[in-house]
Amino acid sequence: GDFIGSSTNLIMVTSTTLMLFAGRFGLXP
C-alpha cells in the first residue's frame, strides 16, 4: 500500500514538473 502511494505521488510530481518545464520553454499553451 505504501509503495503504491509513493509511486502514485511520484508520478503526479513528475507530471507537474514536466508541465512546468513545458510552460517555461513555451512547449505548452
Curated annotation (Swiss-Prot):
Bilayer disposition of the protein: Multi-pass membrane protein
GO process terms (BP): photosynthesis
Keyword Transmembrane appears in the UniProt entry: yes
Compartment list: Plastid, Chloroplast thylakoid membrane
Keyword set includes Hydrolase: no
Spans traversing the lipid bilayer: 3-23
Gene Ontology cellular component terms for the protein in this record: chloroplast thylakoid membrane; photosystem I
Annotated keywords: Chloroplast, Membrane, Photosynthesis, Photosystem I, Plastid, Thylakoid, Transmembrane, Transmembrane helix
Domain of life, source organism: Eukaryota
Similarity comment: Belongs to the PsaG/PsaK family.
Protein name per UniProt: Photosystem I reaction center subunit psaK, chloroplastic
Gene that encodes it: PSAK
